[in-house]
């Protein structure tokens, strides 16, 4: 026996050491831009997550129905897509870091007004105004990430940006329920006013990369020198309404982009409505109560969405050279599987099944959405990526605007008695809306046939 042990020790000693896992090379800018831009999404999402976490208490205080509650989420998006096309136009022509910084600085002041409202209509006006700022941020942030990072790490860069809002919304939902129970729901909105204004300074100091500089550069190619942080960036191309219309027309002429727009909008819209009503669902359809419902909803977002985001980001980078249109394939498969799992949780199932399976379903669906912006950067020329992200966001915003309101309307159609009070049946509403995610997955999978031609066209145009 001793001889066997000695032989084993000798073999282990003779075995070559396992090579250390190579560190990810994030390129000349490092991870700082990705972290700062993730912070922008985080702050935006904290504010967005507070409302679902305190919605029941706000309804009791201001006295409005589920339909009006859904309108609060809808208005946030409706006003946003009014400016989404101009936002993409600006992102393709001016300094994107400065655009984001200015929006953040003003956003912090407006956010605090949520705590001062006295009527439903005042609340609606403030929520609608906040939607404009977040819409302007999105195309500029995504366009920047594509220029900061090479294609072999772009999936992870976008994953970091996409994970931050889910973490922020989870924190917003969870904190909102606790703060509202202790000192009232108005204080919950005051928590997010200051950080946004402070983050604006960090964004202002980020370097402005050249458009397209990180798109598959040759090994010997030296990148163009980056502009100093303080240097103004003039318009790079012609401007005006006609230029905006032309850019939109060019973007809409990319078949893969059209599939990405439709497929992602259906999934994102359905998920937006589900996320908006998640806390109320657990309050009404389980014995968890108000604080418990908000806590479970926050945990589902945190664990499911964030884990799905990071896993998907790494898989996109790993698979993109193995399969044609790998980001699209990953998005379609993940959303289809996630939708099937999610539907099962709205049936009459025990809590021990509902909570973990719903978290897994969210991980799949959100993970699929992470691959969408990576695919856009490959099939769209860098000079119109801002408008491409805007057009995609435009359709997603329309679906997202309708979803909370539609779910609220559907819930009011099915009565549910909770503690002697008649409320809307959210489980039935979710069962009607969730199958739309299957349709989005199908559109994504069918759109892969255009990927090769669109990648070649984008490379020649860029």
Question: What are these model-derived regions, one by one?
Answer:
Residues 16-27, 213-261, 285:
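Juxtamembrane intracellular "pre-TM" segments in multi-pass secondary transporters
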Residues 49, 77-85, 169-170, 302-306, ...:
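Residue-level signature of mid-helix packing/kink "hotspots" within the transmembrane helices
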Residues 51-52, 254-310, 365, 369, ...:
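Extracytoplasmic gate region of multi-pass secondary transporters
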Residues 63, 95, 116-122, 150, ...:
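Helix-breaking motifs and short loop linkers at transmembrane-helix boundaries and internal kinks
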Residues 82-121:
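Conserved MFS/SLC helix-loop-helix module at the cytosolic interface between two early adjacent transmembrane helices
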Residues 98-112, 327-342:
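Structural signature of the two symmetry-related core transmembrane helices
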Residues 126-167:
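Cytoplasmic helix-loop-helix junction between adjacent transmembrane helices
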Residues 161, 165-211:
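Helix-loop-helix hairpin linking two adjacent transmembrane segments in secondary transporters
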